[in-house]
């Protein structure tokens, strides 16, 4: 059976939940839809990690954030960035994991009160850990109300 074709009026009547971005975040990104998938890409040493950490802190005001730190782990550079952006202020809403097992992440996200935002740093390291396109797509489709943010180097 063919899938439904939507008229412009049908699309306009679909209820979507927007993320309540405020201030500079709203100025730059507007109010994106909950459950979107983001891809943040920039050259190495361009401030990407600092931007993502500030973004994660803002997201903690909306819901919990799980930072999948595959490239950097939890070493000195991560410790410094956490201190620089005072991530201890959002201690209860921000968690870091370093396990690249996509099935383990799926189990974690299936639990009640799991993170609303998942930041995967980086896409390349996730791919090396076995995150093939079909598995990643299935993960995103299973958790449609969660926002996935992939960080990538150009």
Regions found by a protein language model. Give the residues of each.
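Short amphipathic alpha-helical surface micro-motifs
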Residues: 2, 20-22, 76-80
């Amino acid at each position: 059976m063919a899938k439904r074709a939507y008229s412009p009026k049908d699309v306009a009547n679909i209820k979507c939940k927007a993320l309540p971005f405020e201030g500079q975040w709203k100025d730059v990104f507007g109010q994106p839809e909950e459950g979107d998938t983001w891809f943040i890409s920039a050259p190495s040493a361009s401030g990407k990690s600092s931007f993502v950490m500030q973004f994660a802190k803002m997201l903690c005001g909306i819901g919990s954030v799980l930072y999948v730190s595959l490239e950097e782990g939890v070493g000195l550079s991560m410790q410094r960035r956490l201190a620089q952006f005072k991530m201890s202020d959002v201690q209860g809403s921000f968690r870091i994991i370093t396990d690249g097992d996509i099935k383990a992440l799926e189990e974690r996200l299936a639990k009640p009160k799991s993170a609303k935002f998942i930041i995967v740093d980086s896409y390349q390291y996730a791919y090396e850990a076995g995150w093939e396109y079909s598995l990643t797509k299935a993960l995103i489709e299973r958790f449609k109300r969660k926002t996935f943010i992939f960080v990538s180097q150009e």
